[in-house]
């Protein structure tokens, strides 16, 4: 996964008034925290933040910090991002400082591959889990988890425990949880009902 860079500034003051003033000039208030450091209040340019989380990796992109005194050069991921519901503008961001040698927990989107056999036969494909919780080293964070549905027939499902993930990547969700399924009646059931 490609590492992005973002410029930050430490901020001395916190609170609603300060945060509003920052947002008015195109900056997003935030905090950097992680193992071995005290939380540090920061601000980041809204456009830089948007550019850092765009693309397949999204919020799981590795981000290198520039500026911010002692935070310069540290690698972070976006732990929490709040947006205004109507405007979609950033309200605040939390960065989690990571160590490249320690596993992290991330939320990764599911990408369906192929056309389900059951869907071709008139069934309805239902994506139950749009994302999965994974644990892996930062360098192993996938942009998405591919789930091949090509052979998925009506009345069948794919569960978390059936996924084949890369070495070192572990799914944290319940292994019995359904990711995707195909619902509907098979041709045999339809024929019996008509007869």
Curated annotation (Swiss-Prot):
Q: GO biological process: what's one of them?
A: translation
The name of this protein is Large ribosomal subunit protein bL25
Q: Does the keyword Transmembrane apply?
A: no
- Reading the lineage from the top rank, the first entry is Bacteria
What transmembrane ranges does the database entry give?
none
Function, as annotated, reads: This is one of the proteins that binds to the 5S RNA in the ribosome where it forms part of the central protuberance.
One annotated Gene Ontology cellular component of this protein = cytosolic large ribosomal subunit
- Give GO MF terms, alphabetically: 5S rRNA binding; structural constituent of ribosome
For this protein, the record's CDD domains field holds: Ribosomal_L25_TL5_CTC
Organism expressing this protein natively: Geobacter metallireducens (strain ATCC 53774 / DSM 7210 / GS-15)
């Amino acid at each position: 996964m490609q590492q992005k860079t973002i410029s930050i500034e430490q901020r001395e003051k916190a609170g609603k008034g300060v945060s509003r003033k920052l947002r008015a000039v195109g900056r997003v208030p935030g905090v950097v925290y992680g193992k071995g450091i005290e939380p540090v209040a920061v601000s980041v340019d809204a456009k830089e933040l948007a550019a850092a989380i765009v693309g397949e990796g999204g919020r799981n992109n590795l981000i290198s910090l520039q500026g911010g005194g002692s935070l310069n050069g540290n690698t972070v991921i976006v732990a929490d991002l709040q947006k205004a519901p109507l405007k979609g503008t950033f309200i605040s961001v939390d960065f989690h400082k990571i160590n490249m040698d320690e596993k992290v927990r991330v939320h990764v989107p599911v990408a369906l591959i192929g056309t389900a056999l059951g869907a071709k036969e008139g069934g309805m494909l239902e994506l139950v889990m749009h994302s999965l919780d994974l644990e892996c080293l930062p360098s192993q964070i996938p942009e998405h988890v591919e789930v091949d549905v090509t052979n998925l027939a009506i009345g069948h499902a794919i569960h978390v425990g059936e996924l084949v993930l890369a070495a070192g990547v572990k799914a944290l969700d319940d292994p019995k949880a359904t990711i995707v399924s195909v619902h509907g009646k098979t041709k045999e059931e339809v024929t019996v009902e008509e007869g």
